[in-house]
Structure formats: structure tokens, C-alpha cells
């Protein structure tokens, strides 16, 4: 995800974003997608190497609606890939599958990411998975090495917060 506070995260954690070229977006809330920052990929705002391959965003049609016009203005520096749930695709050597989530936006995703026989389930900002997602996970034959799960409100024993697991 690329949240509204991405810049401060880069400063606080010493992350050089110039080496990051791909980003999976889970959903369109501003704490996960802040498209205004991508305006700075336009000519006149930043100096990029001549061979810059672009910053690739992957997400649902909801994400596309938020970033399409910005991407057009960046002359190929922001590249959007509209992905569908349960249809694996590759980013380099990583196999990525968007899975349906439940989170109060029309098409939220969580991601199953596989590389060299290792798998990660990235499942933030989702309630208990929809049945289609459970079915896919049961049938796909992947053994997870790690899972990163939603923990919003996890310290509150009796919190009911639709769109979050609260674990």
C-alpha cells in the first residue's frame, strides 16, 4: 500500500523509495492509497533517470478510478495494472494473487505472494475472509510461511469493527 504518510515512513525507517518500482494496493482508503503523491512523477516536479521504468501500481477497478488520470499525466512514470481476484500474475519472480477481502469499499483485496516455494498472506484491513477467499486458500495447494493479519482494535476484547478482524 501507499498511504498518506508514506513520506514520513521513508524518513523514519531510512527507506529509499527510488529502489521501489512495484506496489500492491489493497483498497482505496487514504491510509492505504494516497494518489496525490503520484502527481509529483509529472515532468517538472522530479528528476528521474533516463532509463526509469516507471512506478507500477497494482489494484482493483476502484484503485484504477483513483489513479487513471494521474497516470496519464505522468507520461509512463506511473503505470497502473488493473488486476482481478483469484487470477495470479507475476512481478519479477514473485507470483501474486489478489484475494477478495471484506472492508467497506467495493473491491478490497488481500494478497497471496509466492516466491521460491515460500508464501506470504498479506491480509490487512479485512474482516473475516469471504467464503470465496477461504475456498481459494484451501484449494490452491500453497503452504503459508507467514501471514500478516489485520490487528486494528486488537487490544479491545469486545470491539466489533466491521471491515477489520481485530485480532
At which residue positions do the language-model features occur?
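Conserved beta-strand hairpin/beta-sheet module of binuclear metal-dependent hydrolase folds
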Residues: 1-13, 107-125
Amino acid at each position: 500500500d501507499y498511504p498518506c504518510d508514506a513520506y514520513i515512513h521513508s524518513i523514519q525507517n531510512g527507506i529509499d523509495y527510488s529502489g521501489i518500482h512495484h506496489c500492491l494496493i489493497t483498497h482505496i482508503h487514504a491510509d492505504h492509497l494516497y494518489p496525490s503523491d503520484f502527481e509529483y512523477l509529472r515532468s517538472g516536479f522530479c528528476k528521474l533517470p533516463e532509463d526509469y521504468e516507471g512506478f507500477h501500481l497494482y489494484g482493483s477497478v476502484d484503485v484504477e478510478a483513483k489513479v487513471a488520470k494521474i497516470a496519464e499525466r505522468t507520461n509512463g512514470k506511473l503505470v497502473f495494472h488493473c488486476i482481478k481476484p483469484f487470477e495470479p500474475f507475476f512481478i519479477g519472480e514473485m507470483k501474486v494473487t489478489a484475494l477478495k477481502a471484506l472492508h467497506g469499499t467495493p473491491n478490497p483485496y488481500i494478497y497471496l505472494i509466492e516466491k521460491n516455494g515460500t508464501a506470504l498472506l498479506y491480509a490487512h484491513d479485512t474482516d473475516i475472509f469471504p467464503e470465496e477467499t477461504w475456498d481459494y486458500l484451501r484449494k490452491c495447494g500453497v503452504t503459508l510461511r507467514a501471514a500478516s493479519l489485520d490487528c486494528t482494535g486488537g487490544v479491545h476484547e469486545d470491539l466489533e469493527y466491521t471491515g477489520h478482524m481485530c485480532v
